[in-house]
Amino acid sequence: MAKYNFDEVIDRHGTDCLKYDFGMKRKGRDDLLPLWVADMDFRLPDEILDEFHKRIDHGIFGYTDPLDEYFAAMNHWFSTRYGYTIEPDWVTLGAGIVYALGTSVRAFTEEGDAMMVMQPVYYPFSEVIKNDGRRLVNCQLRYENNHYSIDFEKMERMILEEGVKALIFCNPHNPVG
């Protein structure tokens, strides 16, 4: 892969970019500095763009199935880090984390059920719970000595007191590690 220029500044204003073009619409201000996690401001490497162009030049955009290489890459990642492998039939692909989370919330809980998150956490987790008619229970992460951790005694107490039916556990925890 070629050397990548991380110093290149790309102005994304005027490209229908949620991160930059919708601050006024969503927050009523256009002077905010968006510090997003999953929306990078780096240009894709040419090697990746070339593969996109091959697919585009084919001209057909029907339904696809994940390639064997997808599962091989996933298993390499899991085996390298955790020493185990994933069977392809264990995996259900989704259109994104928020959509997949909403589908899971509706599949495994009922309206009115209590669901727990540990804030600070990726804000759509709480929105999905509330928007799907579930009751949000926040077990605030403990912050001590510049480090976040779970207070397991508090968490257990809240689960029992609030009748929590499901916990959304973000690992690694976004945004605090």
Predicted regions span which residues?
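N-terminal small-domain helix-loop-helix segment of the aminotransferase-like
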Residues: 2-96, 103
